[in-house]
Design a protein with these regions (language model features):
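Conserved binding/catalytic microenvironments
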Residues: 1-245
Length: 245
């Protein structure tokens, strides 16, 4: 029990490093966390560390390593016992494969994630797994579609996310609204993307807001600026967004 707690504490520090966009520091924490999780022989704690390993590798754009971590997740004993853990492992795998531009494998993994998610029940699980609900499933699916260049499917998934996201999760709603704006911009729906981007910014609880949301809005703005559109609404949003991006 003590070794598991140590692993969880170190994993929490790693998660904070990932949020701070310091994947190198996160990896240092995760190497230690993996050691303690292994010594504890707790398969759930080990799975949790590998989930963070995937995120840290993805943040460094080391997608081959991220896929290797996802393979460990989906083949773990807890994934064999519980379809929800299997689904998350397949979903992480799909995202990594999509970023490696391996579309057939990515879509197969996404389908596996969908099948496993449909089999999952409401049994008691570790608290951290509570994030992986239907709204998050659709959000992560949208990232697969976006990485494969299918921004229409990404937009569809994000609309599903925003329709089912729990009340009170304002930061998540802001983030996924920003991703919706980005998918719209990449389809050439510039005026709509501007309106959606403005909505995302309005959801942020403070001017500093969320770095992930700000980064996504910055990517949206870049797409819109690059388009060269001279539409009045687009020009207005470019000027306005420059003050808070």
């Amino acid at each position: 029990m003590l070794l598991r707690l140590v692993a969880e504490v170190i994993s929490t520090a790693a998660a904070a490093s990932i949020d701070a966009r310091a994947p190198g520091r996160a990896r240092m924490h995760l190497d230690r966390a993996l050691t303690f999780a292994g010594l504890s022989r707790d398969v759930e704690a080990t799975y949790h560390v590998w989930n963070h390993m995937f995120l840290a590798a993805s943040q460094q754009e080391n997608h081959a390593e991220a896929v290797a971590g996802a393979e460990v997740m989906k083949r773990s004993s807890i994934a064999r016992r519980d379809p929800l853990y299997a689904s998350l492992g397949h979903m992480r795998n799909a995202n990594g494969l999509a970023r490696l531009q391996r579309p057939s494998e990515a879509l197969r993994a996404l389908k596996d994630a969908e099948r496993a998610f449909a089999r999952a029940d409401d049994q008691e699980r570790a608290e951290w797994m509570g994030f992986y609900d239907s709204s998050e499933f659709d959000a992560l699916s949208s990232f697969v579609w976006a990485a494969l260049g299918n921004h229409g499917r990404a937009e569809y998934s994000l609309h599903r996310t925003l329709a089912s996201i729990p009340d009170g999760m304002t930061r998540n709603r802001a983030l996924y609204t920003a991703h919706l704006a980005l998918s719209q911009a990449k389809q050439g729906e510039l005026e709509l993307a501007c309106a959606t981007g403005r909505q995302a910014f309005g959801l942020l609880p403070s001017p500093s807001g969320s770095q992930r949301t700000a980064n996504t809005l910055a990517a949206t703005r870049k797409v819109i600026v690059t388009s060269g559109s001279r539409a009045a609404e687009v020009a207005e949003w470019i000027e306005e967004s420059g003050q808070w991006i």
